[in-house]
Amino acid sequence: MPIGTPSVPYRLPGSQMERWVDIYTRLGVERILFLGSEVNDGIANSLVAQMLYLDSEDSSKPIYLYINSPGGSVTAGLAIYDTIQYVKSEVVTICVGLAASMGAFLLAAGTKGKRVALPHSRIMIHQPLGGTSRRQASDIEIEAREILRMKDMLNHSLADMSGQTFEKIEKDTDRDYFLSAEEAMAYGLIDRVISHPTEA
């Protein structure tokens, strides 16, 4: 039985009255964002808007992006990635559970020195996926060229973010490549493994 989005009490600054807001709204007040699903256009638009708002409110404070995601759309993920790079605020990325595919890419995209994972997190990198349902050969060829272009761009970005060579990234992402939190740190996808929020 689904429980829905939990609500929590929140007191507006300067007010004596509390009101109930959904947990994500309350976390957003503390500059905490959560990517807890597959990456799609709706999720990306929401995260981009929240990051832009928080950055415009106070770019001297970090934004915390918690990630527990199986990945998803490359183009939607790149919108989030570009925004992480665009905002002046430091973006602390924190893996809780699983950061796979585009989730792992976004984890590695956080501010250097501020990319962390909890001890039992799993991180997985691989090449972008594409599908071909009954379509004309010319359309399949166009899609294949675009997937290869994205694969090359993502691998170059992962190499930059991790410090690994492009060749190693290309080899490792040829198939699903799973890492523990400690292995992801040694690989350069994250900077630290943490077990307490004050360590982030």
From Swiss-Prot:
Role this protein plays: Cleaves peptides in various proteins in a process that requires ATP hydrolysis. Has a chymotrypsin-like activity. Plays a major role in the degradation of misfolded proteins.
Catalytic activity, EC: 3.4.21.92
Known catalytic reactions: Hydrolysis of proteins to small peptides in the presence of ATP and magnesium. alpha-casein is the usual test substrate. In the absence of ATP, only oligopeptides shorter than five residues are hydrolyzed (such as succinyl-Leu-Tyr-|-NHMec, and Leu-Tyr-Leu-|-Tyr-Trp, in which cleavage of the -Tyr-|-Leu- and -Tyr-|-Trp bonds also occurs)
UniProt subunit comment: Fourteen ClpP subunits assemble into 2 heptameric rings which stack back to back to give a disk-like structure with a central cavity, resembling the structure of eukaryotic proteasomes.
GO MF annotations in UniProt: ATP-dependent peptidase activity; ATPase binding; serine-type endopeptidase activity
Similarity annotation: Belongs to the peptidase S14 family.
Cellular localisation: Cytoplasm
Pfam families cross-referenced by the UniProt entry: CLP_protease (PF00574)
Name assigned to this protein: ATP-dependent Clp protease proteolytic subunit 3
Superkingdom of this protein's organism: Bacteria
Organism: Synechococcus sp. (strain CC9902)
Active site: 101 (nucleophile), 126
Lineage: Bacteria, Bacillati, Cyanobacteriota, Cyanophyceae, Synechococcales
PROSITE patterns in alphabetical order: CLP_PROTEASE_HIS, CLP_PROTEASE_SER
CC annotations in GO: cytoplasm; endopeptidase Clp complex
Keywords: Cytoplasm, Hydrolase, Protease, Serine protease
Coiled-coil segments on the chain, per record: none
UniProt-listed GO biological process terms: protein quality control for misfolded or incompletely synthesized proteins
